């Protein structure tokens, strides 16, 4: 029989599963890596579940743990030697559909950003407000706006260099 804590945690996971997968997908396209990262985030959430003091919203807490875990995982992966996968994933986008191709190109450009900028863009794309982004990322609200503006400029420049 499950205790109260386990039931509460299951509800939290049900409610924030999409959010966690969004973070995972922003940091990897490999299905196995995404699942590994998802599991690692769940472990971190479980370990921190008792310590959550509700000084911020649950949404902010989940995003912060998910992003920090993804960023740390990304840093560890960069220190590992590169390997060549045995199989390649099939691109789910139809190359005939130009709007999907544009989205794919945008995500490819976003993935070229450093991990902190990627995290910031992810939160913004998820529709999170500047106040909550600031709380999650540990920066000021003004800095969120400045960073997003600079990231957008960077993405525009990168997209121009790709199309020319």
Per-range role (PLM):
Residues 79-106, 129-130:
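Internal acidic/polar
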């Amino acid at each position: 029989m499950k205790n109260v804590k386990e039931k509460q945690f299951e509800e939290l996971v049900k409610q924030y599963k999409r959010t966690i997968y969004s973070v995972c997908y922003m940091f990897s396209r490999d299905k196995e890596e995404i699942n590994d990262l998802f599991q690692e985030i769940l472990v971190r959430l479980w370990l921190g579940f008792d310590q959550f003091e509700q000084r911020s919203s649950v949404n902010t807490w989940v995003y912060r743990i998910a992003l920090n875990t993804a960023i740390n995982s990304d840093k560890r992966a960069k220190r590992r030697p590169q390997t060549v996968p045995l199989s390649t994933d099939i691109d789910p986008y139809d190359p005939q559909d130009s709007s999907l191709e544009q989205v794919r190109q945008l995500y490819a450009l976003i993935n070229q950003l450093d991990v902190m900028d990627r995290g910031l863009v992810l939160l913004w794309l998820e529709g999170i407000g500047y106040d909550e982004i600031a709380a999650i990322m540990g920066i000021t609200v003004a800095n969120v706006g400045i960073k997003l503006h600079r990231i957008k400029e960077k993405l525009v420049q990168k997209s121009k260099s790709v199309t020319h």
